[in-house]
Structures are given as C-alpha cells and as structure tokens.
A protein has these predicted regions:
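Short alpha-helical scaffold segments that flank and stabilize functional sites
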Residues: 12-15, 30, 96, 119-120
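Asp-based, Mg2+/Mn2+-dependent phosphohydrolase catalytic module
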Residues: 40-61, 73-106, 110-148
C-alpha cells in the first residue's frame, strides 16, 4: 500500500524486459534490524511490486535484501557482507543468474550502491529523476545481459 514508483521506473523495467535484460533489486533494509518491519513485510512488499508489474506483463527477476545493521536489535544486530557498501548480495545474484559483471550495470541512488557495484566490477549509474530516460541513455552504450 505504501508503494510509490520512482518516475519512469515501470517504463524502464518494461524496456529492459522487452530486450531480455535481467532485472534484479539489491536493497539494504535496516528497518528490519531496527524493528520497524519484518522480513515477511519486505518479501510481501517485493511480491506487491511484482504483482503490480505483472498486470503490465513486466517482471523484476529477483530481489536481494539485507536485514542486518550494527545498530539493530536481536539476531539482526550484526555486520554483514551482504549490507551495502559490501557486495555480498551482488555476488549471490552473480552466482545464481550466471551474470557477467563486465556486461552488467547497476543503477542506484546512494554512495553505498556505487561502492557495492565497484567492488563487483560492475559499471554504476546514478539514478536521476526519470529512470526511463536514464535507462534509455544507458542502453545506447551498453551491450546485452544487464544488471539493474
């Protein structure tokens, strides 16, 4: 219910799907560690995203999230190699989907996103106000089998 898509995001994912690009979400979710919401809530949110996309015949291929934070509570209070700026989640996606990092790109909006991509030797692009226009420009310069 709290889902608000960034401008151009749905159209960007649609274009990537149509061109057979792999789309993967990599996200830190410290709200789990802090007790604001649960892992089930995160998974439900991701499922809700894809259910909205499915109505338009669009899909995000996979989701990776890190629920841990050093200031978290209970079992979630810890350092994690998955938490960006580390690249554990990207490594998992690379293994699962047989992704070629040299032919991939990562769109993100934080310095942690940029560092995570760099540690994986993946080209990074800073998200702007319109993700569709950004993806359109990226596609002018990139080859197939991409990572988002």
């Amino acid at each position: 219910k709290d889902l608000k898509w960034k401008t151009g995001a749905i159209k960007a994912i649609k274009v990537l799907n149509e061109l057979n690009y792999l789309t993967v979400v990599i996200t830190n979710q410290s709200g789990v560690a802090r007790g604001y919401f649960t892992e089930k809530d995160v998974n439900n949110f991701h499922n809700h995203m894809n259910s909205q996309l499915k109505k338009r015949k669009i899909i995000i291929n996979d989701f990776y999230y890190c629920p841990y934070h050093i200031l978290g509570k209970g079992k979630y209070k810890k350092k994690s190699l998955d938490r960006k700026p580390n690249n554990g989640m990207i490594k998992k996606a690379i293994r699962k989907w047989n992704i070629d990092s040299n032919k991939s790109f990562f769109v993100g909006d934080t310095f942690a996103d940029q560092m995570s991509a760099q540690k994986s030797n993946i080209k990074f692009y800073k998200a702007n106000k319109n993700l569709y226009l950004l993806i359109k420009n990226i596609l002018k310069y990139e080859s197939r089998q991409k990572f988002l």
